[in-house]
Curated annotation (Swiss-Prot):
The keyword ATP-binding does not apply. InterPro entries: RNaseH-like_sf, YqgF, YqgF/RNaseH-like_dom, YqgF/RNaseH-like_dom_sf. It comes from Jannaschia sp. (strain CCS1). Its EC number is 3.1.-.-. It is found in: Cytoplasm. GO terms for biological process: rRNA 5'-end processing. GO terms for cellular component: cytosol. Its main location: cytoplasm. This is Putative pre-16S rRNA nuclease. Keywords: Cytoplasm, Hydrolase, Nuclease, Ribosome biogenesis.
Length: 160
C-alpha cells in the first residue's frame, strides 16, 4: 500500500523489519537497507535497470532475502517543491510495485530526495573514493542518504 506521509507509513511497517530505500534513475536503481531497529541505513547495491518486470523481480529477491517490511522511494522534487516528470515516473513505479502480488504486503512511502546525490558525491569525494568507484556506488549511497532521512523522521515521530 502506498502512503503519502511518513506518519501513515510508520503505522504500517511491521515491528522488527527493516526498510529498503530506492533511488530511481533512468539507468540504475540505487538500493539501501536499514537495520531492523530502523536507526541506520547502509548502501546495499545498484541494480541495472532493464524492464519493469525484471527490475521488480530483482527488488523482490532483495526484499525476501533481507526480510524487509517497507520501501522508501526517493521522490525527486524540483527545488521549488513542485513535482516534475521524474517525480511522476517515481510515483508510477511505486504504483506498479504495489499492484504486484509479491509487494502487496509492503508499505511504500516517499521521501524528498533533493540534493541526495550531491551529498553522496561529496561524501565519496571526502572519503577519497576514485572516480571509477564513485560511479559504481553513487546511486546506492544516494539511496542510503534518502533512507537515512526517512529513518530520522520516523525516529522523531516515535519520540513525539
Amino acid at each position: 500500500m502506498i502512503f503519502e506521509t511518513l506518519d501513515e507509513f510508520a503505522g504500517a511497517v511491521p515491528p522488527m523489519r527493516g526498510l529498503i530505500g530506492l533511488d530511481l534513475g533512468t539507468k540504475t536503481i540505487g538500493v539501501a537497507l536499514s537495520d531492523r531497529l530502523l536507526t541506520s541505513a547502509s548502501a546495499l547495491e545498484t541494480v541495472k535497470r532493464k524492464k519493469f518486470g525484471v527490475d521488480a523481480d530483482a527488488l523482490a529477491g532483495l526484499i525476501a532475502k533481507h526480510e524487509v517490511g517497507g520501501i522508501i522511494l526517493g521522490l525527486p522534487r524540483n527545488m521549488d517543491g513542485s513535482e516534475g516528470p521524474r517525480a511522476q515516473a517515481t510515483r508510477a513505479f511505486a504504483l506498479n510495485l504495489s499492484r504486484r502480488g509479491d509487494f502487496a504486503h509492503l508499505a511504500l512511502g516517499f521521501w524528498d530526495e533533493r540534493l541526495s546525490t550531491v551529498a553522496a558525491e561529496r561524501a565519496l569525494i571526502a572519503a577519497d573514493t576514485s572516480r571509477k568507484r564513485r560511479s559504481e556506488v553513487i546511486d546506492a549511497v544516494a539511496a542510503s542518504y534518502i533512507l537515512q532521512g526517512a529513518l530520522d523522521r520516523l525516529r522523531h515521530l516515535r519520540a513525539v
